């Protein structure tokens, strides 16, 4: 797979976030709605070398881009420590598209999947 085809996450357009997040999925009882919560610990996007305002989280793969504006910064002892991005889907097709991105992102970053029981 060519490097430009790798799935990636960006908080600033054109700048890939190298920190791999913990991702938690929840789904509604009907299976069509749900959310994915991305938790980045000490992301580069919060480092002193980055400038500008974070206006969202872009999930980019060979199919295109998924965007969410639901991004929060969590502070520990007055220092920015975590970025938390939440992607909400409301249809099965949105979920299917997200899962294609998630699988591509996992392959690009050598990640696996585990189900909480």
Curated annotation (Swiss-Prot):
Disulfide bonds: none
Pfam family, one: Psb28
InterPro entries for the chain: Psb28_c1_sf, PSII_Psb28_class-1
Subcellular location: Cellular thylakoid membrane
CC per GO annotation: photosystem II oxygen evolving complex; plasma membrane-derived thylakoid membrane
One of the GO BP terms on file: photosynthesis
Membrane topology: Peripheral membrane protein
Keywords: Membrane, Photosynthesis, Photosystem II, Thylakoid
Superkingdom of source: Bacteria
PANTHER family: PHOTOSYSTEM II REACTION CENTER PSB28 PROTEIN, CHLOROPLASTIC, PTHR34963
Family the entry assigns: Belongs to the Psb28 family.
HAMAP family for the chain: PSII_Psb28
Quaternary data: Part of the photosystem II complex.
Protein name, as recorded: Photosystem II reaction center Psb28 protein
Organism in which the protein naturally occurs: Prochlorococcus marinus (strain MIT 9515)
Organism lineage: Bacteria, Bacillati, Cyanobacteriota, Cyanophyceae, Synechococcales
């Amino acid at each position: 797979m060519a490097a430009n085809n790798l799935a990636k996450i960006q908080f600033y357009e054109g700048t890939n976030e190298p920190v791999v997040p913990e991702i938690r999925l929840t789904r509604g009882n009907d299976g069509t709605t749900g959310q994915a919560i991305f938790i980045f610990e000490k992301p580069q996007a919060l480092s002193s070398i980055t400038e500008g305002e974070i206006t969202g989280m872009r999930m980019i793969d060979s199919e295109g881009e998924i965007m969410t504006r639901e991004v929060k910064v969590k502070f520990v002892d007055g220092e920015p420590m975590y970025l938390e991005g939440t992607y909400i889907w409301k249809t099965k097709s949105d979920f299917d598209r997200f899962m294609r991105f998630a699988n591509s992102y996992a392959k690009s970053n050598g990640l696996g999947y585990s189900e909480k029981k």
